[in-house]
Amino acid sequence: MSMPATSTKTTKLATSLIDEYALLGWRAMLTEVNLSPKPGLVDRINCGAHKDMALEDFHRSALAIQGWLPRFIEFGACSAEMAPEAVLHGLRPIGMACEGDMFRATAGVNTHKGSIFSLGLLCAAIGRLLQLNQPVTPTTVCSTAASFCRGLTDRELRTNNSRLTAGQRLYQQLGLTGARGEAEAGYPLVINHALPHYLTLLDQGLDPELALLDTLLLLMATNGDTNVASRGGEGGLRWLQREAQTLLQKGGIRTPTDLDYLRQFDRECIERNLSPGGSADLLILTWFLAQI
């Protein structure tokens, strides 16, 4: 399909650099979905708490999204002179078109809608920073993405409409701000918790997959995951957070033997129909930011 125009301004970014970041985004999505075993999530072992999607759907979806990530970067570069609050409006048509390709690739299954939002923001932030000759670091990328989202939670969640979206309902009932709140705050769960935790485990020589699984547990224990709350209510969310925290307190995932705990956790999540998709999205960002 035809791609939305980004801007009338030109970008000075090299195509090879843009493609390099887009490739990292694709690899981040594949790394997350292939990671196994993940409680309640689609992985190489099973489909978790999902009956409508499988591993191959995520592979097709990631490939479709990869083709759009350069457009997010280019728009971030071309809009570098705009006020940051104005950037999000220009990103929306790119995100919607990307989402359309995702649904076509998966025959209508929502595999990566959250990642289109979050990776799209980070890619646009990278484009802006590169265009302005500013350092591209996890902190600068997330703070720039946050500047794009200033006021987003207030605009989209604090509403008194009679027909509430799922996100608005969870905000009003439980105070959960979900992906919008995390983005507007500059991804603090990633920057302050998941990313340093993951990098520390790698520095200690832990196997990268075990380190990522342990980091996923950390996110599940701390994230107010709206995916979980929409399926299991506040009780389901608190149960999942408590179980993840208990595993971390017992030592987390440090050896292949510890994977037995995750397999049991996975079975319990499937029985309760709980899937921590929001934490999975944040794990994608964690891996992505660890590479830059």
Swiss-Prot record:
Its EC number is 2.4.2.52. Keywords: ATP-binding, Nucleotide-binding, Transferase. It comes from Shigella flexneri serotype 5b (strain 8401). InterPro entries: CitG (IPR002736), TriPribosyl-deP-CoA_syn_CitG (IPR017551). HAMAP family: CitG (MF_00397). The keyword Amino-acid biosynthesis does not apply. It comes from the Bacteria. This is Probable 2-(5''-triphosphoribosyl)-3'-dephosphocoenzyme-A synthase. One of its GO terms (molecular function) is triphosphoribosyl-dephospho-CoA synthase activity. Belongs to the CitG/MdcB family. The gene is citG. Coiled coil: none annotated. One of its GO terms (biological process) is prosthetic group biosynthetic process. It is an enzyme of class 2 (transferase). The keyword Transferase applies. It catalyses: 3'-dephospho-CoA + ATP = 2'-(5''-triphospho-alpha-D-ribosyl)-3'-dephospho-CoA + adenine. Transmembrane segments: none annotated. Pfam families: CitG. NCBIfam families: citrate_citG, PRK10096.1.
